[in-house]
Each structure stands twice: as structure tokens, then as C-alpha cells.
Amino acid sequence: MITVRDLSWQYEPLVDGGKPVDSLKHVSFDIKSGSFVGVIGPTGAGKSTLCMALAGIIPNLADGTMTGLVEVNGMNTSRHSVSALSERIGYVQQDPEAQLFCASVEDEIAFPLENRGIAPDIIDKQIDVMLDLVGMTGSRKRVPTS
């Protein structure tokens, strides 16, 4: 279950003396478990900002001001770390070339495991298991855009 109540987000100004940028204004909705939902709208409508709020990236890792409530399966996303939220919530960038963190397939698989504090030797083994599971053995060092 996803609950959003009166959610607003304002990005910090991009330049000194600039004005904050409103991205979301008073958004409210509920999504029942098992639902399949698409978010559509023109460029700049706040679709990505909304998805980042659902994943807890906003307000935890972005500069700006959030008001309202975002809960995913009873977890208030503004009161939990991104690491804790990542155990239950995933987020995929619109543009894979603008990915936030990882340079290789190996790094992409390792990232959430590292955030959960899993030992490097276990991560190394898990990468091989996951690549084998999806038929990508031998792609460990490949960069996602190649």
C-alpha cells in the first residue's frame, strides 16, 4: 500500500539569490497492494520527483523542502534511511546514462548489498550467482551503456 498525503517538494535554488523551484504541490493518492500504476505527464511535471519521494531519495538525499506524508507499506519514507527503504522499495532512473552511482554491471549488483553491510567476499560470490541466474555470466565488468 502506498499513501501520499498533501505532498509538496521545493528544490533549493540552483544559483545564489535564485528562487526555489516548486516540483510537487499538494499531491494526494493511495495505491493498493498489487496494483499496476503508470505516472505520465509532460517534461517538468514532477514524475521523477514523485518517484524519488516514494523511494525516500527525497527528502533524504536531495536538497529541498518537503511537506506532507509518503508511506510505503506503513513506512514513512522521510523517517527511514535510504538503506532501510531499499530493502522494500526500488527506483530506476528514466535515463540509464544518468544513473546515480554505478559504472559497471558488477557495481550495480554490489551497490544495494554494500548498503546493507554485507561482507565483500559474500558480495563477490552473490554477483556471480545473480549474473548466472539471469544468463549474464561473463558480463561482470561490462558498463550498462555498452
Where are these regions (language model features)?
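The feature captures the beta-strand-to-loop junction immediately N-terminal to the Walker
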Residues: 40-45
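Conserved ABC ATPase signature
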Residues: 143-146
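Short helical segment in ABC ATPase nucleotide-binding domains corresponding to the A-loop/adjacent helical element
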Residues: 55, 90, 97, 103-114, ...
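A short, flexible loop at the N-terminus of ABC-type nucleotide-binding domains that lies
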Residues: 1-4, 9-26, 58-63, 79-81, ...
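Conserved ABC transporter NBD signature motif
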Residues: 63-75
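Short, conserved post-Walker A segment of ABC-type ATPase nucleotide-binding domains
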Residues: 37, 48-61
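Conserved ABC ATPase "signature" region
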Residues: 121-140
